[in-house]
Amino acid sequence: MATFLVVLRRSGPQWDPSRPIEEQSDWPAHASFMDGLVDAGFVVLGGPLADEHRVVLAVEADSEDAVRATLMRDPWSETHLRVDTIDPWTIRLDGRHASPRAARGMESAPFG
């Protein structure tokens, strides 16, 4: 059964800290691979943290092993971004879908 997992990836040995993520070597191949994972429904959310040396992914997969096997196919898997941690994630709040409040016309936040 598919479950949500949070993946933290950290910069690898070929990461150039003087360059932004989009200017790292072999960026087009990595970006294309990751876009494919989004299209396949594997990656739900993802992106770099502010330091751009770490990336967080929320994925939907059957197991940690499946996540590792999938990410090993990334052209950056050992050179630019290595898997640091993979943790199961229980989603309690999900704003990706219309909330019952929005459906009832109560779109403003109760605290803002």
What is each stretch, according to the model?
Residues 1-112:
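Conserved, structured core segments of small domains
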